[in-house]
């Protein structure tokens, strides 16, 4: 998609340069050509995703019944790359995907990542654990603190 936009821009620029009597080095478009070039500028005016749409997209991703271990890790890696702490409902879906895959290590790692992403905001991680406690109990997942991993 980006490649097509770049090609359109370069084709438009080449058309203006060919139309110029001075060639490529000093294009001087005619008065009517400036408006044509201006309408072909390559800006990104895509729609912005709301928080609810973002959450729904990730919950849907982790709720895929045929998700495999690689997709789980890729999704978590992408999610961790964002400048945010994932909502508990996203983490819940990721933990359930771990359970479907019988991947206890990834489940604990997800909780470690959430704690790390919370950074200096010490109230975020306890809130997330409080919200996830029913899911953790249902799935039999221990927190890193319960496993003693916070002492290492």
Swiss-Prot record:
The reply to whether Transit peptide figures as a keyword in the UniProt entry is yes
Q: How is it modified after translation?
A: In response to mitochondrial stress, the precursor protein is ubiquitinated by the SIFI complex in the cytoplasm before mitochondrial import, leading to its degradation. Within the SIFI complex, UBR4 initiates ubiquitin chain that are further elongated or branched by KCMF1.
Q: What is this protein called?
A: Cytochrome c oxidase subunit 5A, mitochondrial
Q: Which GO terms describe its cellular component?
A: mitochondrial inner membrane; mitochondrion; respiratory chain complex IV
- Tell me the residues of the organelle transit peptide: 1-43
What Gene3D superfamilies does its record include? Cytochrome c oxidase, subunit Va/VI
Tell me the Gene Ontology biological-process terms attached to this UniProt entry.
mitochondrial electron transport, cytochrome c to oxygen
Q: Does the keyword Acetylation apply?
A: yes
Q: Which UniProt keywords apply?
A: Acetylation, Heme, Iron, Membrane, Metal-binding, Mitochondrion, Mitochondrion inner membrane, Phosphoprotein, Transit peptide, Ubl conjugation
Pathway of action? Energy metabolism; oxidative phosphorylation
Q: How does it sit in the membrane?
A: Peripheral membrane protein
Q: Where is this motif: SIFI-degron?
A: 2-22
Which gene is the coding source of this polypeptide chain? COX5A
Family statement drawn from the similarity comment of this UniProt entry: Belongs to the cytochrome c oxidase subunit 5A family.
Where is it chiefly localized? Answer: mitochondrion
| Phosphothreonine modifications at | 143
Q: Which residues carry this modification: N6-acetyllysine?
A: 89, 115
This protein's species is: Bos taurus
Where is it located? Mitochondrion inner membrane
GO function terms (MF aspect): cytochrome-c oxidase activity; metal ion binding
The entry's function note states: Component of the cytochrome c oxidase, the last enzyme in the mitochondrial electron transport chain which drives oxidative phosphorylation. The respiratory chain contains 3 multisubunit complexes succinate dehydrogenase (complex II, CII), ubiquinol-cytochrome c oxidoreductase (cytochrome b-c1 complex, complex III, CIII) and cytochrome c oxidase (complex IV, CIV), that cooperate to transfer electrons derived from NADH and succinate to molecular oxygen, creating an electrochemical gradient over the inner membrane that drives transmembrane transport and the ATP synthase.
Oligomer and partners: Component of the cytochrome c oxidase (complex IV, CIV), a multisubunit enzyme composed of 14 subunits. The complex is composed of a catalytic core of 3 subunits MT-CO1, MT-CO2 and MT-CO3, encoded in the mitochondrial DNA, and 11 supernumerary subunits COX4I1 (or COX4I2), COX5A, COX5B, COX6A2 (or COX6A1), COX6B1 (or COX6B2), COX6C, COX7A1 (or COX7A2), COX7B, COX7C, COX8B and NDUFA4, which are encoded in the nuclear genome.
């Amino acid at each position: 998609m980006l490649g097509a936009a770049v090609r359109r821009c370069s084709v438009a620029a080449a058309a203006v340069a060919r139309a110029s009597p001075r060639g490529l080095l000093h294009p001087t478009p005619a008065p009517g050509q400036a408006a044509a070039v201006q309408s072909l500028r390559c800006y990104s005016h895509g729609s912005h995703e709301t928080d609810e749409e973002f959450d729904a997209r990730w919950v849907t991703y982790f709720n895929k019944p045929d998700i495999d271990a690689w997709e789980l890790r890729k999704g978590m890696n992408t999610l961790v790359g964002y400048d945010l702490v994932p909502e508990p409902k996203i983490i819940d879906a990721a933990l359930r995907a771990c359970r479907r895959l019988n991947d206890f290590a990834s489940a604990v790692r997800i909780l470690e990542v959430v704690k790390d992403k919370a950074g200096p905001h010490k109230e975020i991680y306890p809130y997330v654990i409080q919200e996830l406690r029913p899911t953790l109990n249902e799935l039999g997942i221990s927190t890193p603190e319960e496993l003693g991993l916070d002492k290492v």
